[in-house]
Amino acid sequence: MAASAFLLIASFLLVLMALAKPLGSLLARLINGEALPGVGGVERALWAVLGIRQEEMDWKRYLLAILLFNTLGLVLLFAILMCQGVLPLNPQNLPGLSWHLALNTAVSFVANTNWQSYAGESTVSYFSQMAGLAVQNFLSAATGIAVAFALIRAFARQSATTLGNAWQDLTRVTLWVLMPISLIIALFFIQQGAIQNFSAYQPFTTLEGARQMLPMGPVASQEAIKMLGTNGGGFFNANSSHPFENPTALTNVVQMLAIFLIPAALCFAFGDAVGDARQGRAILWTMTVIFVVCVALVMWAETTGNPHFLTLGADSAANMEGKESRFGILASSLFAVVTTAASCGAVNAMHDTFTALGGMIPMWLMQIGEVVFGGVGSGLYGMLLFVLLGVFIAGLMIGRTPEYLGKKIDVREMKMTALAILVTPALVLLGTALAMMTDAGRAGMFNPGIHGFSEVLYAVSSAANNNGSAFGGLSANTPFWNLLLAFCMWFGRFLVIIPVMAIAGSLAAKKAQPASPGTLPTHGALFIGLLTGTVLLVGALTFIPALALGPVAEHLSLVK
């Protein structure tokens, strides 16, 4: 089992890095504003048709464009979901969503969270899936990448007042990165057996003679961007454990690679854009080290399983509950860590059925801000916040003004960094407390004990950190839960983006100073250790008390 786990992790990472390096070079060209071969004329025509001026924006205009773009997307998606009963491509005649579910869903997909308080096959029409949810899968991913582009330019430029053009970044990322790769992945999924049609649901008779319905729909096209854009919202309620979404072991691997592809590529792009590839590799190494340790822990917890199984006559204590037999424990464990390390949230197994420790690791990966690869764009700018915090701590220890890539980190940057890092923990802890203190919050809990608290903590952690996965065991389609989670999703997304853009504007205006003998190298093993320690320390100090009340207590009750 250990050898199989090692081979699975090693082969996954090798293929990932081989794919991410060339994509990183493409992203670096987009960051630098270089014209891509063969598309320059297309872009110029597009700017003219759309009325996009090619002048660059300062950080305030860039931020305003991002906020306006996403707010308009929220309004449009909310309207589509409310009115889907009278819109086309609705062969099952599904009615419009309730106002609070429509609001929750619209916020969820615009904020790149894809939390779902509904079952897709019984709630959302084909038109809503394609024109609403799938479109936002592209646009929310492009938003995260655009913000990352702006922050990377801030480190790469000197004495600059602008960070690029938001409209051009959103358009170029969508047209030349997200759409082509999604098309390739979608065609591969169709070849492997994922469905892509507009048929009405198909009736069939089971072996027991019961009549049931097979849901249909344009699944493969949405599945591709769902994974590539670290969105995660499933076409069906079973998400990537459904054979129509994830039909084979090969598609399972491709889905995991798609989740990490752009976050890993952005690390390479960062190194290329700032003129020092070692800087990007240091961040990538930090992410990889934490990721490998977390995967190993989950695999160990799930293969060790529940010792009480043996006393009840089971052949093995290994925990196969809630997992697809065609994927098994190792692939399910790897998928769980990949989807929660990134802000994806897609699942090929039910996280609620993992062991206490096996479920705690995915929860903790979300709680530290999903900076271990993380979401497209958001993972890199989230980790760069920890980089700034790490060099600040190092500067305090050696008595020097902290600096990164030659740029001094002043009070303004540290205030914004602290604000961005503290937003999601505050939302998680306050949201969980509110849910546990109110009758409306507790009414949604199917498990009132220790595990019930873990389910609530997981749900709010998932929403505030824009992941979207769930433990289950929670009746979330109520006004209280829909509004609470919508609040956490929206502000967990944009109250981080706002200080990140402020940091970008401040850093872009600074000149890079040449390195001196006392400058902390930010590309070696020492810095990788410092950055890893910073991430772990912040996560430990913030969430250990809450985790002790949930999964830790549950584990201790199991082994006592």
UniProtKB/Swiss-Prot annotation:
From the Swiss-Prot or TrEMBL record, what is one GO molecular function term?
Answer: potassium ion binding
The record's comment on protein family reads: Belongs to the KdpA family.
Q: How does it sit in the membrane?
A: Multi-pass membrane protein
Q: Where are the transmembrane segments?
A: 6-26, 63-83, 132-152, 175-195, 250-270, 282-302, 327-347, 356-376, 379-399, 416-436, 483-503, 524-544
Tell me a GO cellular component.
Answer: plasma membrane
UniProt KW Ion transport keyword: yes
Q: Decide whether keyword Iron is in the record.
A: no
Q: Which superkingdom, per the lineage?
A: Bacteria
Q: What is its main location?
A: membrane
- This one is known as Potassium-transporting ATPase potassium-binding subunit
Subunit details: The system is composed of three essential subunits: KdpA, KdpB and KdpC.
Matches recorded under InterPro entries: KdpA (IPR004623)
Where it sits in the cell: the answer is:
Cell inner membrane
A Pfam match is KdpA
Organism of origin? Cronobacter sakazakii (strain ATCC BAA-894) (Enterobacter sakazakii)
Q: Quote the function comment for this protein.
A: Part of the high-affinity ATP-driven potassium transport (or Kdp) system, which catalyzes the hydrolysis of ATP coupled with the electrogenic transport of potassium into the cytoplasm. This subunit binds the periplasmic potassium ions and delivers the ions to the membrane domain of KdpB through an intramembrane tunnel.
Protein keywords: Cell inner membrane, Cell membrane, Ion transport, Membrane, Potassium, Potassium transport, Transmembrane, Transmembrane helix, Transport
